Amino acid sequence: MTGRNDWPSQLAGPKSVNKSFFYPSVGGSVVLSELMPNLNKDYLSYMKVRGSWASVGNPFSRYAANPHFPWIANDGRWSQLTDYPMYDLKPERTNSWELGLSMRFLKNFNLDVTYYSAKTMNQTFNPDLPVSGFSKIYIQTGAVRNSGVELSLGYNNTWNGFTWDTGFTFSTNKNKILTLANDAIN
């Protein structure tokens, strides 16, 4: 179990509403084969189930909530603000969970299966604005779900000093856009 609170400089503007973000995680596993004393080790020598959940944050780009006016030395002036300042931006947030199973069986085989799912929200981008005095505005929209399965099957054996170790893997991943701002497709 973990917990962390970040105070990144991107959120530190004088008018920023969200100056920090907290993200926790928790994970656990149980070795089921240790809980079964009568287990025939020739058939199933090891079995573990595991699970975890985490929520992580990622700040948006610099100066989105804390506008700056760089000095243009060769012109001897401050630059104009071209991005509309936003003060209530939230960090990008990803909530994810994972379930897995690890096994060793028939003396020489091993299997590992994992299912995962992650949802990312508050994705920040800055589309062009129509004529308004500003050229861009930061908006937070968009949610994406990323989920999939990972599977590996292995075999290991030794005969008279010769070792054979092989493995096969399979994975599938699906990304789905859950929400987008209206007319935000490029």
Predicted regions and their residues:
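Extracellular/periplasmic, surface-exposed regions of secreted and cell-surface proteins
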Residues: 1-186
